[in-house]
C-alpha cells in the first residue's frame, strides 16, 4: 500500500482532535492519498457524503461525492485507468441538527479495517508530478493518487513523538526494504520542514521546533531519528546496547556496527576450504580478492606500481606519498598524528597502558596493544609461517606480512619508501628512518605499511654471490621488545660460513670471502628509536671456528642482550683489533680504513645496510663496501 502524507494549505487547520493527548503511535496510511482536482475546501460540505472506493489491493479510499449526483451507485464496479477495478460503497455521514459537516485539515478518519487515515486538502502542485496518477471517476471528478512507496502493513509503524523516546514497541522478524526506510525518512523530514505549528501530543514540529524530534520506528529494528539536524550529517543513529552508545550517520552503518555486538556474520566465503564469514558484503568482496589475486585499485603516483584489494587500502597508501596524517592523538602534549584511525587507536594505548590482547600459551603471560603484534607473537609458539615468498627459487616463509613485504625488495630494484622532506627513495624503511634523522633531524617514527602490493619483474632478481655465506636471520618484533636468541646453524655445503642468528630465522644474505675480508667485523645495531647499539670490534673478532657470544652495548655504555656469532673455519675473516682504530661519529661506527664503513640493522633484525651514506640493500651495501675497501669509488646507485 501507499505511504500517506499529511499536507495543508495556508488556510488549513492544523489541530488534531484531542490535541492535549499523550504522544501516540499512528499506523501509517493504509489507503492511497487522494486529492480532489477542483481544490474545493472540505468545509461547509452541505449535502455531501464521503464515497468509499475499495481499490484492487483491498484498501479503501474516501472521495468527496455530492448526494444529489446519482452517477455513483453503491456496489458499482469502476474501471480505473490502470485497468484495476474499484468497488463503490456509499457511506452517508449524518449531520448534527443545524450544523454543517466540518472535515478539518489533518482530522483523523477511522477506516473500516480499524486503521486511521488523515484528511488533507492541498493543491496537487505540491506533490512530485511524476508520482501522481490521475483517476477519472464516473461522476466526472478527477482524483489524483499519490504513489510514494509500498509500505507493508505488518512491518512499519511511524511513531511521532515530541520527547524523542519510544516505548512499548514489539519487535518483529520482518526485513524492511531500504526504499521503505528512505521514504519514511523523507516523509518525516518533509513534515519537519513544512510544519510551523502543531499540537505537542502529536510530535509534529511546532512552536519549540528546535527541541522536538521525529522518530521513525520500524518493528524489529533500532530507533531512527529524523530532524532538521539530520540533514547536516549529524550522527543521529545511536547504538542501544548496554555500555556502547556509539552514534552513526546512517541506519546502515548502525546495523553493521550492531553485528559487532551480536557476532552476526551473514556473508560467507564460498571458496573451497575457506569458510570465513564477514559482517558486510564489502568485507566479503575484499576477502574474495585474496583468493583471486585481484587488486583493482592502482596507485596513480608516478613511478609507483602498487595496487590494492580495496579503495580504503589505496587511500591509506596514497597518504605515504602526500604525507597526510589526518588522525591526531587526542592526548594533550603528544602531537602525534597518523595515516589511519586504527594506528592511532593502537598508539593511544601507549598513553593508557592498555594491552587487551593476552597470550594464552601456558607460562607466557605476555600482552599486546595491537591484534597484529599479538597474532605475530602467537606464531612463535605455533611455528606458523603463513607468508611465503612467491619469487621462483626463493620459497622463504615469514610469520608476518610486513616481513614478507620487506623481504621482497631483495628481488627487485623497487624503492617503495620516499622521504617527505627531499623526495629520495629507499628500499628499506629503516634506511629511510636513518636518512631522515641524519639529513633532516627528523626523529618522528615511520609507520610501516601492513598491506601493500608488490609484483616482482619477471626474471629479475639479485645475483647470488658464490663462496662463503654470512646469514643474518631476523628476530621477531612484539610491541617494543625484541627477542634475540641463538637458533640452529646448519651447514649449507659451503666451506666457510658465518651466521648471526636470532629466534625467528628468515632472511639470508650471501657474501663472498673477498667481501668478508674487505668488510671486517664491526657491527652497529640501530634500534627503531635511533639508539645505536655497538658490538665492539675486540669482542666481535672471530679468529677460529666456534661460537662467540658478545653483549650488545648501548651508546651510553649499558650492556644489553646477548648476540651469538657462530663461525666455521674463518681464519681469512680474522682481523686483529690492534690493526683497527675506531672512532664514534654521529650514529656511525667507522674504521680508519680508506672509507668509513659500518654495518647497521634495526632492532628486530629485518634489515641490514652499510652506512656509506644511504644504502638501501644489505647485499648492495656489502658489495660497495668491498669495492671501497679495495680502493674503488663506486656511486651509491651502482
Swiss-Prot record:
Give the matching InterPro entries: Znf_C2H2_sf (IPR036236), Znf_C2H2_type (IPR013087)
Q: Where does the record place the modification N-acetylmethionine?
A: 1
Point out residues bearing the modification Phosphothreonine.
352
Q: Which UniProt keywords apply?
A: Acetylation, Activator, DNA-binding, Isopeptide bond, Metal-binding, Nucleus, Phosphoprotein, Repeat, Transcription, Transcription regulation, Ubl conjugation, Zinc, Zinc-finger
Q: Which GO terms describe its cellular component?
A: nucleoplasm
Q: Name one Pfam family in it.
A: zf-C2H2
Q: Which residues form a coiled coil?
A: none
Q: Which protein family is named in the record? A: Belongs to the GLI C2H2-type zinc-finger protein family.
The protein's role, per its UniProt record:
Transcriptional activator. Activates the gene for selenocysteine tRNA (tRNAsec). Binds to the SPH motif of small nuclear RNA (snRNA) gene promoters. Participates in efficient U6 RNA polymerase III transcription via its interaction with CHD8. In complex with HCFC1 and ZNF143, regulates the expression of several genes, including AP2S1, ESCO2, OPHN1, RBL1, UBXN8 and ZNF32.
Full protein name = Zinc finger protein 143
- Annotated organism of origin: Homo sapiens (Human)
Q: Which gene encodes it?
A: ZNF143
Amino acid at each position: 500500500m501507499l505511504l500517506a502524507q499529511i499536507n495543508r494549505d495556508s488556510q488549513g487547520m492544523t489541530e488534531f482532535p484531542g490535541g492535549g493527548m499523550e504522544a501516540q503511535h499512528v499506523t501509517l496510511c493504509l489507503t492511497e492519498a487522494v486529492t480532489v482536482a477542483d481544490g474545493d475546501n472540505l468545509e461547509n460540505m452541505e449535502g455531501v457524503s464521503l464515497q468509499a472506493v475499495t481499490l484492487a489491493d483491498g484498501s479503501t479510499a474516501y472521495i468527496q461525492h455530492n448526494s444529489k449526483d446519482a452517477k455513483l451507485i453503491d456496489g458499482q464496479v469502476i474501471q480505473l485507468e490502470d485497468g484495476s477495478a474499484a468497488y463503490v460503497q456509499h457511506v452517508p455521514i449524518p449531520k448534527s441538527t443545524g450544523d454543517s459537516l466540518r472535515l478539518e485539515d489533518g482530522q483523523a478518519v477511522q477506516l473500516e479495517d480499524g486503521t486511521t487515515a488523515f484528511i488533507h486538502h492541498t493543491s496537487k502542485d505540491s506533490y512530485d508530478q511524476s508520482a501522481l496518477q490521475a483517476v477519472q471517476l464516473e461522476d466526472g471528478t478527477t482524483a489524483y493518487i499519490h504513489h510514494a512507496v509500498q509500505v507493508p502493513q505488518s512491518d512499519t509503524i511511524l511513531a511521532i513523538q515530541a520527547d524523542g523516546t519510544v516505548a512499548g514497541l514489539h519487535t518483529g522478524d520482518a526485513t524492511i526494504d531500504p526504499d521503505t526506510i528512505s521514504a519514511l525518512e523523507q516523509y518525516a523530514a518533509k513534515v519537519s520542514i513544512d510544519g510551523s505549528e502543531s499540537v505537542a501530543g502529536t510530535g509534529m514540529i511546532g512552536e519549540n521546533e528546535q527541541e522536538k524530534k521525529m522518530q521513525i520506528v520500524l518493528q524489529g529494528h533500532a530507533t531512527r531519528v529524523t530532524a532538521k539536524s539530520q540533514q547536516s550529517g549529524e550522527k543521529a543513529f545511536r547504538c542501544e546496547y548496554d555500555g556502547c552508545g556509539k552514534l552513526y550517520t546512517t541506519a546502515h552503518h548502525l546495523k553493521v556496527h550492531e553485528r559487532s555486538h551480536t557476532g552476526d556474520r551473514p556473508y560467507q566465503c564460498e571458496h573451497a576450504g575457506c569458510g570465513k564469514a564477514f559482517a558486510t558484503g564489502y568485507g566479503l568482496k575484499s576477502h574474495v580478492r585474496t583468493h583471486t589475486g585481484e587488486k583493482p585499485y592502482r596507485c596513480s603516483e608516478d613511478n609507483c606500481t602498487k595496487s590494492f584489494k580495496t579503495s580504503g587500502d589505496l587511500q591509506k597508501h596514497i597518504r605515504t606519498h602526500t604525507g597526510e596524517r589526518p588522525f591526531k592523538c587526542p592526548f594533550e602534549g603528544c602531537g602525534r598524528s597518523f595515516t589511519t584511525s586504527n594506528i592511532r587507536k593502537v598508539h593511544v594505548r601507549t598513553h593508557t597502558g592498555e594491552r587487551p590482547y593476552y597470550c594464552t600459551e601456558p607460562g607466557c603471560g605476555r600482552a599486546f596493544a595491537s591484534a597484529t603484534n599479538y597474532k605475530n607473537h602467537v606464531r612463535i609458539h605455533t611455528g606458523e609461517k603463513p607468508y611465503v615468498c612467491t619469487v621462483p627459487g626463493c620459497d622463504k616463509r615469514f610469520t608476518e606480512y610486513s616481513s614478507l613485504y620487506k623481504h621482497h625488495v631483495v628481488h627487485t630494484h623497487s624503492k617503495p619508501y620516499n622521504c617527505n622532506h627531499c623526495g629520495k627513495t629507499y628500499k628499506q624503511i629503516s634506511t629511510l628512518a636513518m636518512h631522515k634523522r641524519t639529513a633532516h633531524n627528523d626523529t618522528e617514527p615511520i609507520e610501516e605499511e601492513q598491506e601493500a602490493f608488490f609484483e616482482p619483474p619477471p626474471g629479475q632478481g639479485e645475483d647470488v654471490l658464490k663462496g662463503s655465506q654470512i646469514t643474518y636471520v631476523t628476530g621477531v618484533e612484539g610491541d617494543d621488545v625484541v627477542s634475540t636468541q641463538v637458533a640452529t646453524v646448519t651447514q649449507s655445503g659451503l666451506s666457510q660460513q658465518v651466521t648471526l642468528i636470532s629466534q625467528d630465522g628468515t632472511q639470508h644474505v650471501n657474501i663472498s670471502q673477498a667481501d668478508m675480508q674487505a668488510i671486517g667485523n664491526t657491527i652497529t645495531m640501530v634500534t627503531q628509536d635511533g639508539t645505536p647499539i655497538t658490538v665492539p670490534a675486540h669482542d666481535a673478532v672471530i679468529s677460529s671456528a666456534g661460537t662467540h657470544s658478545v653483549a650488545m652495548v648501548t651508546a651510553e655504555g649499558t650492556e644489553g642482550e646477548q648476540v651469538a656469532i657462530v663461525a666455521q673455519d674463518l681464519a681469512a675473516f680474522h682481523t686483529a683489533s690492534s690493526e683497527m682504530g675506531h672512532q664514534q661519529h654521529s650514529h656511525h661506527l667507522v674504521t680508519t680504513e680508506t672509507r668509513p664503513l659500518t654495518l647497521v640493522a634495526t632492532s628486530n633484525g629485518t634489515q641490514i645496510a652499510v652506512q656509506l651514506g644511504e644504502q638501501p640493500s644489505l647485499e648492495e651495501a656489502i658489495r660497495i663496501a668491498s669495492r671501497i675497501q679495495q680502493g674503488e669509488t663506486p656511486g651509491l646507485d651502482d
